[in-house]
Amino acid sequence: MAADSDLRYYLGVKNAFLGHLNPQLNEASILYRNLGGAKFKDVSSEMNLVDLGWSGDATPIDGNNDGWPDLYVLSMQGHDEYYENVGGKRFEKKSRDVFPKTPWGAMGVKAFDFNNDLAVDLFLTDMHSDMSEDVGPEREKMKSRMQFGEEVLRSNGQSIFGNAFYQADGKGGFSEISDKIGAENYWPWGLSVADLNADGFQDAFLTSSMCFPYRYGVNSVLINEQGERFADAEFIVGIEPRANGQRIKPWFELDADELDVENRYCKDRTGKVVVWSALGSRSSAIFDLDDDGDLDIVTSEFNSEPMVLLSDLSDKKKINFLKIKLVGGESNRDALGARVVLKIGDRRLLQVYDGVSGYLSHSLHPLYFGLGESSQVDEIEIVWPSGKTETKIGPLDANQTLTIKENG
């Protein structure tokens, strides 16, 4: 009711879950240009970046290696979109040209170098494809046997019904290899990527599960086996099962005698009826919480308090690592967008500092490089967001935090 006592009505859409079928009703994603002084300008149309998909996330990635960040935009139902940055002047849609098939129900994304070839790969999680059927644990590592019809999917044969992993060829092309490397899991939200075992290859942590009325889904730890494939490790490293084996908790209460007597959960029951729901993680951050040299995980939870998962790796074995904190000068303060390469003998370790961590989340913390058996780094090369390249010559000792300032 408005202040003038005139009634206002809002009509909900019955098939809101199928909003992708009517993109003309959607709000467009917006690109804001930072003008400085806490002012921003909508430049979506000006930059040819008008996207009407049901998007919950996006990630920058320099897919064609021209030094300009391109943009991969997720769609929670339908086709993802990919826009190439044309010299910072505009974007060109290259979606199907570069990615012929994309996840139908994409929820999370992370760009990182999987196999240490200095090319940035792309890992996407797909949750909504898992909603089309109930499956048991035996199918959790398999693609969905999609049960929605084409009238809902609008796929035209261009969808992947599960997670996708696009391996970059370093020339602007990508190959989808999710099944080959074991990148599938069940009911994922977002993912965080970090070197959990400090061997020099980045691993992945995928938050999973859904609340009432769906069942519990385990959080996944995917250990990177030397850039060849992922190995499932959530039960080995102690992420699963949860503390005390807890997978559910009370969700809400019904009154089977009066208010909720017609509810299907109150049939043949009296008094108060407690409805239980599965626990589930939504997002995560990976960093060295207790400053002991290994990486810990903090999750955000639905209908529950956060989980703090402390690693004891450094208590069990000698590890080598290097943390790098970047401080922008000419670039943005946090140096978001910087590209860092460590040179260790014949090895090259690449990370792009984009802050992306978990579902709809960003985190600012030092870059963490696991060094394997190496106790020193020969050289660090940084390409700052400003375009400037700086090199820090070693040898640089492992097991420390370096603060590197642009033009410092």
Identify the residue ranges that each predicted region occupies:
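Hydrophobic beta-strand segments that make up the repeating blades of beta-propeller
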Residues: 1, 66, 70-75, 122-126, ...
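Surface-exposed loop and edge beta-strand positions of immunoglobulin-like domains
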Residues: 61, 74, 112, 125, ...
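Gly/Ser/Thr/Pro-enriched helix-cap/hinge segments flanking short amphipathic alpha-helices
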Residues: 173, 228-229, 233-238, 250, ...
